[in-house]
């Protein structure tokens, strides 16, 4: 069991030269494999910063889940591509750009890690007009 806020805060500190805003509910603890979870969150942050200039992370607790939102202000991903980008090595030509570094594994690895924790990842349009990654984990 780990304090989710501590984990997120420590990860975000590694990106001190980047624009990342966090808004975390207090006292969120969750069962996690710490190193795997850190890798997942870093993949999501790296993805957001690769395509946008700003990332926002916030958390919300429901009756049965903890939800982590990772928003960016990049070009987003068309809804018809949401399932495809979860596949290993899948890259989008137009909306996110082939000129970016990466091989198309970040979202796939993050998805696998969250699923192994009993949760799921979904993609939506962000209020920042980019991509919102919604991570839902059981309490």
Which residues does each predicted region cover?
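Conserved catalytic submotifs in the C-terminal HATPase_c
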Residues: 21-31, 63
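A residue-level detector for a conserved hydrophobic packing site
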Residues: 37-41
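Short beta-strand/loop element within the Bergerat-fold HATPase_c
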Residues: 54-64
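Acidic ATP/Mg2+-coordinating residue in the GHKL
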Residues: 72
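Short conserved segment of the HATPase_c
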Residues: 77-90
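Short alpha-helical Gxxx[C/S/T] motif in the catalytic ATP-binding
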Residues: 106, 110
